[in-house]
Regions:
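Single-stranded nucleic acid-binding surfaces, predominantly the OB-fold ssDNA-binding core
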Residues: 1-235
Length: 235
């Protein structure tokens, strides 16, 4: 990934398959400024599939010819950031916030490269952590612990409010955080689906959630309380 991208507070490097032909969402006379949207699919080591919303402009591909190569079925390598935007008047199955990958560099992998899904975000907690235990249990019979966070990440394009999920020891560490605390989170981007029930509607809607799954959390507050993040294990 480009070194300038790596130094920022919001970065993602990911490899996946384009599932739909990119369509134009913002036209421009200059090919570099045309904005496209499509879907990106990748398979986790566990076999579960993630499907993300992907946006890129012409300049991310490098040349006008390379834009044409980014089509359904090809594997691409992406360097960019995670962005969010409000959705006005969403449908029942839509979230109020659109969360997507914005590619600043996109290239067809030919030949294929090693798999990648690496995220780094740096920002401030903007909502109290939500700590809970799930119904599922570990191999030792203990309930799994989970903490959900929303991190406000500033950039020259505005502020993105990125959902994060932490498990196990990382969930315990994250639960000590408060609104306004500065954190650094390292992990991977993932999607998951759940059924959303709406009053007055008979069938539940299948809703997709996008979030950063934290492998490691850094925070001054965590260290002050003697809770070293190195004790956590990767998810």
């Amino acid at each position: 990934m480009d070194q300038k991208i790596m130094e920022r507070s919001n970065t993602i490097g990911i490899v996946g398959i384009i599932t739909d032909k990119p369509y134009l969402i913002l036209d421009a006379s200059e090919w570099r400024k045309r904005l496209y949207e499509t879907k990106l699919e990748r398979v986790r080591p566990s076999g579960a599939k993630d499907i993300f919303i992907l946006q890129f402009d012409g300049s991310a591909a490098g040349t006008e010819k390379r834009i044409e190569e980014i089509t359904k079925g090809v594997e691409v390598m992406i360097g960019g950031e995670i962005r969010t935007e409000n959705v006005y008047d969403p449908r029942p199955e839509e979230n109020r916030v659109k969360i997507y990958i914005y590619a600043e560099m996109i290239a067809v992998n030919d030949p294929p490269v090693d798999d990648q899904n690496e995220v780094t975000i740096r920002g401030n907690i903007c909502r109290p952590p939500y700590y809970r235990q799930t119904r599922s249990r570990t191999v030792k019979g203990k309930r799994r612990t989970v903490t959900n966070l929303i991190v406000a990440v500033n950039s020259n394009k505005g502020t993105n409010y990125i959902p994060c999920v932490c498990f196990g020891w990382q969930a315990f560490l994250a639960n000590a955080l408060e609104v306004g605390d500065y954190v650094e989170i390292y992990g991977r981007f993932q999607s998951r689906e759940y059924r959303k029930r709406i009053d007055g509607q008979k069938p539940p809607y299948l809703v997709t959630v996008y979030e950063v799954c934290a492998n490691k959390i850094k925070s001054r507050k965590i260290k002050e309380e003697g809770q070293e993040e190195e004790r956590g294990s990767d998810v």
